[in-house]
Amino acid sequence: MARGPKKHLKRVAAPKHWMLDKLTGVFAPRPSTGPHKLRECLPLIIFLRNRLKYALTGDEVKKICMQRFIKIDGKVRTDITYPAGFMDVISIEKTGEHFRLVYDTKGRFAVHRITAEEAKYKLCKVRKTWVGTKGIPHLVTHDARTIRYPDPLIKVNDTIQIDLETGKITDFIKFDTGNLCMVTGGANLGRIGVITNRERHPGSFDVVHVKDANGNSFATRLSNIFVIGKGNKPWISLPRGKGIRLTIAEERDKRLAAKQSSG
C-alpha cells in the first residue's frame, strides 16, 4: 500500500511544456508542493538549467539557489524544485535580471524579461471570496494567496494587482466584456484577446468568447480566462508574438520572409 506522497516523476510523464527529451534520463524533477499545480508550473531547476542555461546539472542549480541569489515574487527560494507558475516574477539579483512567467502561443512558459520597475508587482486572478470569522472578508487568488479586507467591489474572476513588497492590493480589473485577457488553459493556451461575450450555463461551464488582435475569434471556458488589462491596454508587458497564434501557413510565410530579408 502506498503511504505518503509520491516523490518521483518519470520523464515521459512530465508535462509536455517543460520540453524535456525522453532519452537523456529516466526521471524528471518532481515539483515540490506549492502555490501552483504540478502540471501548470515550471520548477526552478528547469528554468535555470534548461531555459536560461545558467547551469549544466542539477547540482550546479542547487549551488546557485543555496547562495540565495534567486527570488520568486520577492522572496528568496532555495528549493530547486519550487513550482514557479503563471505570472510569477523571478529575479536574479546578481545579474540584475527579472523574468515574468507568461505563456507563449504554443502553450509553453516563455523566457520573458521585464524591467526592474515591472518586477515590483504581479497580477492575480481571484478564485474565491468569502466572509470569515468575525465578519472579516477574504479572497483567495490563483497563486494561493489569501488576502483579508479586500475592496468589496472585487468579485471572483476579477484580476488584482499586487505589490510584491507588501503583498497588498494596489488596483484591480473587473471581469468584463471589452477587457484584454490571456487564456491559461485548454487548446487556446497562451492566446491573448479582448473578451466579446460570456455565455452562462448554470450547472455546467460558462463559455467566454474572445477576439484577438488579428480579428480571429475563439471560445474557451471561463476558468481558463485571466484578465490582463483594461480595454485593450495590457497591465504587463507581453511576450514575443503578443499572444497572436498564427496558422501553420502564416508561420511558414513569416519564416520565408525572414529568410529572404536576411539572405
UniProtKB/Swiss-Prot annotation:
The UniProt function text for this chain reads: Component of the small ribosomal subunit. The ribosome is a large ribonucleoprotein complex responsible for the synthesis of proteins in the cell.
The family assignment reads: Belongs to the eukaryotic ribosomal protein eS4 family.
Where found in the cell? Answer: Cytoplasm
One Pfam family in the UniProt entry: 40S_S4_C
Gene name linked to the record: rps4
**HAMAP family found in the cross-reference section:** Ribosomal_eS4
Q: Which GO terms describe its biological process?
A: translation
Give the quaternary structure: Component of the small ribosomal subunit.
| The keyword GTP-binding belongs to this UniProt entry's keyword annotation | no
Q: Which InterPro entries match?
A: KOW, Rib_uL2_dom2, Ribosomal_eS4, Ribosomal_eS4_C, Ribosomal_eS4_central_region, Ribosomal_eS4_central_sf, Ribosomal_eS4_KOW, Ribosomal_eS4_N
- Gene Ontology CC terms: cytoplasm; ribonucleoprotein complex; ribosome
Query: Which keywords does UniProt give here?
Result: Cytoplasm, Ribonucleoprotein, Ribosomal protein, RNA-binding, rRNA-binding
Q: Where is it mainly found? A: cytoplasm
Q: Which GO terms describe its molecular function?
A: rRNA binding; structural constituent of ribosome
- Domain of life according to the entry: Eukaryota
Per UniProt, residues of the S4 RNA-binding domain are: 42-104
This chain's protein is named Small ribosomal subunit protein eS4
